[in-house]
Amino acid sequence: MKRQGGYVPARGDAVWITLDPQAGHEQTGRRPALVLSPATYNGRVGLALLCPITSQVKGYPFEVALPNGLAIAGVALADQVKSLDWRARKASRICAVPEDVIVQVLRRLNVLLAGTA
């Protein structure tokens, strides 16, 4: 999504964003991430809910594979959701991710939040 001041991340966007500082097993550095929160929230609040994308596929149950043919490859890590200031961390759009990927990520996240299987 674009607005008068420039790009605002929208749900379903894959973006480059800086994840530092990090601790423990968290992803670090300037990395791709998947935006889960809607552009209306992101633009108004200046934060976005994102999950990192990695090319290191391990077969972990909370990984959601990105389809072939996108400008980015790998898996979204649904259990590593972060709320980040996308302006301060210089988010830039890579591409749009298909809706079915977003649905899969949200379902896996729901397992953690609601305790459902």
Protein language model annotation of sequence segments:
Residues M1-A117:
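Conserved functional hotspots at enzyme active or ligand-binding sites that engage polyanionic ligands
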